[in-house]
C-alpha cells in the first residue's frame, strides 16, 4: 500500500496513536515521558508502512528526541528502528545473580562502623527520593532523573513488589545523611535488583557490597536463590561488580534515539 493510505488517529485520552487503512487498524504506538524527561516509544506489531507515520505523529506532538529499546536478539526490529532514523545509543545486558553468600563472596561482608543501615520503610520519604534522584545521575541513560513526589511514593512503597527487607538505605551515623541504597523488588518471577548505589564521597569503602550482602542474605533466607539485574555494557564498575558476584549474562537490549527533526529516512527535516 502507498504510505498516504495510512491515517493516524490519537486515542483519547492517553498517549497512544493508532494507524488505520480505511477502517482497518494496521499499527499502533505508545509514548511515555520518564522522570528524566526522555520520551520513550513502543510499537505494537503492525504493517510495515504504519511505523513511519505513527512515529511522525508522536514526534509532532512531543517536539522532542524520541527513545526506543529492543532486545538484541530482535534483529528485524533493530533494523526497523535504524530504518526509521534511530541511532544506537547504548547496550544493556541482563544478568542472573545467585543470592547464596557462599557463592557471591558476600558472606561476612558488613558496612563500615560509621554507617547505619535501615529499611526504606523506616526512611524519610523526601530524603529517600532525593537520594534516588542523586544516584541516578551516575547511572547511564538516567541522568536528569527527577521523581515527582507522588509518582515516587507509588513506585517505591505502594507497589505490590515492595520488600522492606531488601529495600535498604545506608545512613551516615554522624550526620544522619542518606548516602546509599539497594532496592530489590519481589515479583511473580525472580526478584530484580533495581538500583544499587552510593553517593560519591562514600564510595570505595565496600558499602555497595555490604548493602548487597544484606539484601541478598534476606532473599536467600526467604528461599529466593537468584536475582536479575541490568547493567550498561560500557559502565565497567557495574559490570565488574555483578560478575564478581558470580552473575551470568542472560541477554540484552539496545537503546536507540531519534533526534528531533530527523525523519524516518534518517535525514534532517
Language model region names:
Residues 1, 8-11, 115-130:
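A short beta-loop-alpha structural element at the N-terminal edge
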Residues 1-2, 7, 131-146, 158-160:
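Helix-loop element at the rim of GNAT/NAT acetyltransferase active sites that forms part
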Residues 1-12, 259-269:
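Actinobacteria-biased recognition of intrinsically disordered, low-complexity terminal regions
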Residues 3-62, 67-72, 179-191, 199:
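Conserved donor-binding loop and adjoining core beta-sheet/short helix segment
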Residues 29-36, 141-198:
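A conserved beta-strand-loop-helix scaffold within acyl/acetyltransferase catalytic domains
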Residues 45-116, 254-258:
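Acyl-donor-binding surface of acyltransferase catalytic domains
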Residues 48-61, 198, 204-221, 239-244:
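Conserved acetyl-CoA-binding loop-helix of GNAT-fold acetyltransferases
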Residues 82-105, 213, 220-269:
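Active-site/acyl-donor-binding loops of N-acyltransferases
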Amino acid at each position: 500500500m502507498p504510505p498516504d493510505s495510512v491515517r493516524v488517529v490519537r486515542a483519547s485520552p492517553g498517549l497512544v496513536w493508532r494507524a488505520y487503512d480505511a477502517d482497518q487498524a494496521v499499527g499502533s504506538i505508545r509514548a511515555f515521558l520518564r522522570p528524566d524527561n526522555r520520551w520513550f516509544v513502543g510499537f505494537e506489531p503492525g504493517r510495515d508502512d504504519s511505523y513511519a507515520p505513527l512515529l511522525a505523529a508522536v514526534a509532532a506532538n512531543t517536539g522532542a528526541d524520541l527513545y526506543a529499546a529492543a532486545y538484541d536478539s530482535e534483529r528485524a526490529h533493530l533494523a526497523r528502528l535504524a530504518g526509521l532514523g534511530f541511532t544506537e545509543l547504548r547496550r544493556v545486558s541482563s544478568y542472573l545473580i545467585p543470592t547464596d553468600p557462599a557463592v557471591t563472596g558476600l558472606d561476612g561482608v558488613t558496612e563500615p562502623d560509621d554507617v547505619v543501615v535501615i529499611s526504606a520503610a523506616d526512611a524519610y520519604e523526601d530524603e529517600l527520593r532525593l537520594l534516588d534522584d542523586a544516584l541516578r545521575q551516575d547511572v547511564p541513560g538516567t541522568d536528569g532523573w527527577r521523581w515527582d513526589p507522588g509518582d515516587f511514593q507509588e513506585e517505591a512503597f505502594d507497589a505490590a513488589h515492595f520488600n522492606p527487607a531488601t529495600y535498604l538505605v545506608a545512613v551516615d551515623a554522624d550526620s544522619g545523611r542518606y548516602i546509599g541504597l539497594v532496592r530489590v523488588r519481589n515479583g511473580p518471577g525472580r526478584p530484580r535488583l533495581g538500583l544499587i548505589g552510593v553517593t560519591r564521597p562514600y564510595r570505595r569503602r565496600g558499602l555497595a557490597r555490604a548493602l548487597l550482602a544484606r539484601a541478598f542474605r534476606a532473599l536467600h533466607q526467604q528461599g529466593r536463590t537468584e536475582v536479575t539485574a541490568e547493567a550498561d555494557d560500557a559502565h565497567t564498575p557495574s559490570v565488574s561488580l555483578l560478575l564478581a558476584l558470580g552473575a551470568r549474562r542472560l541477554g540484552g537490549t539496545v537503546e536507540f534515539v531519534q533526534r528531533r527533526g530527523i525523519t524516518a529516512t534518517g535525514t534532517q527535516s
